Amino acid sequence: MKYRVRDILEYTIAIVSEFASKFNLTEKQAYRYINFHKGLNFIEENYGIIHTLDFNEAVDSDAIFCRKNGGEL
């Protein structure tokens, strides 16, 4: 299924914002961390599934993915 780029971007922005709150980061720091550890790719590639999850579960899934790629949060 094809998803609109706008939907993916809006969801990604929301995930970054919630990630920042959860880990006490600025949104800029959260974006850089998630991007560096390939979490943005994870969101984009798995949008079809991840956007159906509970929002906190989606943030946790992205955090786990980032940890698997060297992140420490």
Question: What residue ranges belong to the model's regions?
Answer:
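C-terminal alpha-helical interaction appendages
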Residues: 1-73
